[in-house]
């Protein structure tokens, strides 16, 4: 019984052992994944950075925008590159784009710098004694003058000279607010709130195209979708270093000299259902607007201080006709066609059947009229003739063919960007003024009202210049390039070898993101090229910025833009050094693919390697593990620190770290050299002692024997020599030769040393051969023993498996028999129910 019980216990142990072995084999079959660092991967994140500008300005042109652009911008790239990103979808939001804010600040800087060297009109903030201007009625009836002018006389501050000048009624206000109609005392409109600066007499403010560029380490993504509305995902994306040339045209209601839609008209709004939000319309065909100030007049120069002059319209005793009368003309057919398309588009978006365009409901002159700069004068044109029509799906009422003439007023004192405390006095321009522009967009607002109504009223808007820049920057966004990526691989770092080579330079910067739409496996193949393009782009941009900064330093006009360029230059180098510092901390300096000892945690991402490397892009992968990137970085750093400690302890053992180096050729040469030195030293000592011995004997009167004299060899203690009475063995004595002379002694010693070395070396070789023979024999026996043991255990495993299968089969059979027996009994019981009922009834009847 005990034997059977032990046998059963052994069988159970074998069963559990086989199960554990299977579990271990299953666990070992799962491949371990390790974190691998990649440098040069196409990954970016949304960012805010300092942009710099590029332009084709000419320093010899005295126009204000040219002067500003010469000082503030770098030259444009003669061969701009735009690289399409395949399989990339990116979200854009034109209403929350920091590029708009930066451009707004930059254009303010443009105007401020243009006005900086000009005269401040603080001495002109005095009382003006004004009367109505006497005009000659020579008008042709087509254009009516809407605003009167005042002929004013005043004394310049700190002077007694009385000056006469004409001012537009819009530029002056009566001092006595209670009696505005009959008042004769006036002041300039902005004297009590703003500092008025007179524009330089030769400034015309003619805008030139300005490109806004991202510094090195950053890129600008561009949406190339022709129907993109400014917000949401865009699947047709490219990367550029600079935007297209944007003309900083200051205007309201109508957008001038911008870009056109390539297909149909595009309506853009942050929230079209919110009537407070501005509606930006991008036309698909431009409409020419020609503005003219048809009358000439003269201007006078009044000295108001040391090297300071005020330019005004001559007022005293000079009849100049309708001075300042201006107008703009637009093709009625082109405007009618564009407005009809806008109405149709708005009707579809707002779900309205009738769209009515009406003039502005009121506000500042910049909002109620179309404001633009024409030849240096600021025109304020009445657009009520443009926005006065109704459009529906069946019929429309509006303009006929012909020309629409917009009456315009001219203001000399203009609020700059609606900023408190900033105003500009535009000096009068002599001669005729003509300018031609292209209407490429509209700024509109809607009245709102009942949502269930089928009617909607649209009015012109504007005033916030950010909307002007937004109409051009809607398709751009700035991103920060993150060239370091981590991903799981099967490779694990074994030994850290410190690399001293640096990553090379070459190619161009934009090619770095060219592989953004490729899978991770395809993109990782070109890491070296992409890393070189990253550094090359930094160097290329730094050279351009440095040239611009050097030019500013030469002109001694290093402005805010110069500081921005310095910031961009330093920022790019700092970002590159930061990435290199991270790679150095992780032990990955100079490497594009760097394995680590950090195991990949499936909680970060449980995707398979094939799914990661064959189906995902680097951007998709980065979004998936973005929450764990900081943790992975810290684990890599801790692993590298521990590895450096281990490496230090290993290096302290010095040459024991690698025993194989003992058998290198350099080591063998060193061994031979050491052997020769030892042999030479022994021979030298032998010679020295022999000479000293001979000299000592000669001094004692001893004469050396000849070379043929044989001396008896001392016998051992077991071989006694001949004694006095009984003779021993003498016939087999050996003798040694006593040499005489330095060279003979040297030869004898060298011969004996060689013989000694030969015998010892032979003995050593024989011993080594014997050891190798024994080791081989023992090793062979050990291999045979292991083979037999392996066969034995394999047989045992087979027997155990067979026994386990037999046991399982027997147990299954027994349980199956029991189940069958139970089923049979149940069936019999069911079948016997009628019989039992019958028997019971029979007993009851008996």
Swiss-Prot record:
It holds the Pfam family GP120. It comes from Human immunodeficiency virus type 1 group M subtype D (isolate NDK). Residues 291-327 are annotated as: V3. Highly glycosylated by host. The high number of glycan on the protein is reffered to as 'glycan shield' because it contributes to hide protein sequence from adaptive immune system. Palmitoylation of the transmembrane protein and of Env polyprotein (prior to its proteolytic cleavage) is essential for their association with host cell membrane lipid rafts. Palmitoylation is therefore required for envelope trafficking to classical lipid rafts, but not for viral replication. A motif (YXXL motif) lies at residues 702-705. This is Envelope glycoprotein gp160. Residues 696-846 are cytoplasmic. One of its GO terms (molecular function) is structural molecule activity. A motif (Di-leucine internalization motif) lies at residues 845-846. Inhibitors targeting HIV-1 viral envelope proteins are used as antiretroviral drugs. Attachment of virions to the cell surface via non-specific interactions and CD4 binding can be blocked by inhibitors that include cyanovirin-N, cyclotriazadisulfonamide analogs, PRO 2000, TNX 355 and PRO 542. In addition, BMS 806 can block CD4-induced conformational changes. Env interactions with the coreceptor molecules can be targeted by CCR5 antagonists including SCH-D, maraviroc (UK 427857) and aplaviroc (GW 873140), and the CXCR4 antagonist AMD 070. HIV-1 lineages are divided in three main groups, M (for Major), O (for Outlier), and N (for New, or Non-M, Non-O). The vast majority of strains found worldwide belong to the group M. Group O seems to be endemic to and largely confined to Cameroon and neighboring countries in West Central Africa, where these viruses represent a small minority of HIV-1 strains. The group N is represented by a limited number of isolates from Cameroonian persons. The group M is further subdivided in 9 clades or subtypes (A to D, F to H, J and K). Disulfide bonds join 53-73, 118-200, 125-191, 130-152, 213-242, 223-234, 291-328, 374-435, 381-408, 588-594. The gene is env. The lineage of its organism: Viruses, Riboviria, Pararnavirae, Artverviricota, Revtraviricetes. Residues 652-673 are annotated as: MPER.
């Amino acid at each position: 019984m005990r034997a059977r019980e032990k046998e059963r216990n052994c069988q159970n142990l074998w069963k559990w052992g086989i199960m554990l072995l299977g579990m271990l084999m299953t666990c070992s079959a799962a491949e371990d994944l390790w974190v691998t660092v990649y440098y040069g991967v196409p990954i970016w994140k949304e960012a805010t950075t300092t942009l710099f500008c590029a332009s084709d300005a000419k320093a010899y042109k005295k126009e204000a925008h040219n002067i500003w652009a010469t000082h503030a911008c770098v030259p444009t790239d003669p061969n701009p590159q735009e690289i399409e990103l395949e399989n990339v979808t990116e979200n854009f939001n034109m209403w929350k784009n920091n590029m708009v804010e930066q451009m707004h600040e930059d254009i303010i800087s443009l105007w401020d710098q243009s006005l900086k060297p000009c005269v401040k009109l603080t001495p002109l903030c005095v009382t003006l004694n004004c009367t109505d201007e006497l005009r000659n009625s020579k008008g042709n009836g087509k254009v009516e003058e809407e605003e009167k002018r005042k002929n004013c006389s005043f004394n310049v501050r700190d002077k007694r000279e009385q000056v006469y000048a004409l001012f537009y009624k819009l530029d002056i206000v009566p001092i006595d607010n209670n009696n505005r109609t009959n008042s004769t005392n006036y002041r300039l409109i902005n004297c009590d709130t703003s500092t008025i600066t007179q524009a330089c007499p030769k400034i015309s403010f003619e805008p030139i195209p300005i490109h806004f560029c991202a510094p090195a380490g950053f890129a600008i993504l561009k949406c190339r979708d022709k129907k993109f509305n400014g917000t949401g995902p865009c699947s047709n994306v490219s990367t550029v270093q600079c935007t297209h040339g944007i003309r900083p045209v200051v205007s309201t209601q109508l957008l001038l000299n911008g870009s056109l839609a390539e297909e149909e008209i595009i309506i853009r709004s942050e929230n079209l259902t919110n009537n407070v939000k501005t509606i930006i319309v991008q036309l698909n065909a431009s409409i020419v607007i020609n503005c003219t100030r048809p009358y000439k007049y003269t201007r006078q120069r009044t000295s108001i201080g040391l090297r300071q002059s005020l330019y005004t319209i001559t007022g005293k005793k000079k009849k100049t006709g309708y001075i300042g009368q201006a107008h703009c003309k637009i093709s009625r057919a082109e405007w009618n066609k564009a407005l009809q398309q806008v109405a149709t588009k708005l009707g579809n978006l707002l779900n309205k059947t009738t769209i009515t365009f009406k003039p502005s409901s009121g506000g500042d002159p910049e909002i109620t009229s179309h404001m633009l700069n024409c030849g240096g004068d600021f025109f304020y044109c009445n657009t009520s003739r443009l926005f006065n029509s109704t459009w529906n799906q069946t019929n429309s009422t509006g303009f006929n063919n012909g020309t629409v003439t917009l009456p315009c007023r001219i203001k000399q004192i203009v609020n700059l960007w609606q900023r408190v405390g900033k105003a500009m006095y535009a000096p009068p321009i002599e001669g005729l003024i003509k300018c031609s522009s292209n209407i490429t967009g509209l700024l509109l607002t809607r009245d709102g009202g009942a949502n269930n109504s089928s009617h909607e009223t649209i009015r012109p808007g504007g005033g916030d210049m950010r909307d002007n820049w937004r109409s051009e920057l809607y398709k751009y966004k700035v991103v920060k390039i993150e060239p370091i990526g981590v991903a799981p691989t099967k490779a694990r770092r074994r030994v850290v070898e410190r690399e001293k080579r640096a990553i090379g330079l070459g190619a161009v910067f934009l090619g770095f993101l060219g592989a953004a739409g490729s899978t991770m496996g395809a993109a990782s193949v070109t890491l070296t090229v992409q890393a070189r393009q990253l550094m090359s782009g930094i160097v290329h941009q730094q050279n351009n910025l440095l040239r611009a900064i050097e030019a500013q330093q030469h002109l001694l006009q290093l402005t805010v833009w110069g500081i921005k360029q310095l910031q961009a230059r330093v920022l790019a180098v700092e970002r590159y050094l930061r990435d290199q510092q991270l790679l150095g901390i992780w032990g990955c300096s100079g490497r594009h693919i760097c394995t680590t000892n950090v195991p990949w945690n499936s909680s970060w991402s449980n995707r398979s390697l094939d799914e990661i490397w064959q189906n995902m892009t680097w951007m998709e992968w980065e979004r998936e593990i973005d929450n764990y990137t900081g943790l992975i970085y810290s684990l890599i750093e801790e692993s590298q620190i521990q590895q450096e400690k281990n490496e230090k302890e290993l290096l302290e053992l010095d040459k024991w770290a690698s025993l194989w180096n003992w058998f290198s050729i350099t080591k063998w040469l060193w061994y031979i050299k050491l052997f020769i030195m030892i042999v030479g030293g022994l021979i030298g000592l032998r010679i020295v002692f022999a000479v000293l011995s001979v000299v000592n004997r000669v001094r004692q009167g001893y004469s050396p024997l000849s070379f043929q004299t044989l001396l008896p060899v001392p016998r051992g203690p077991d071989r006694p020599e001949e004694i006095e009475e009984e003779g021993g063995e003498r016939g087999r004595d050996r003798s040694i030769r006593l040499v005489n002379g330095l060279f003979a002694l040297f030869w004898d010693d060298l011969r004996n040393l060689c013989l000694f070395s030969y015998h010892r070396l032979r003995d050593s070789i024989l011993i080594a051969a014997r050891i190798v023979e024994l080791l081989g024999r023992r090793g062979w026996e050990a291999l045979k023993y292991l083979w037999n043991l392996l066969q034995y255990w394999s047989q045992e495993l087979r027997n155990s498996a067979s026994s386990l299968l037999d046991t399982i089969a027997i147990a299954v059979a027994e349980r199956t028999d029991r189940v069958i027996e139970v089923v049979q009994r149940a069936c019999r019981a069911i079948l016997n129910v009628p019989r039992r009922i019958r028997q019971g009834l029979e007993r009851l009847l008996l």
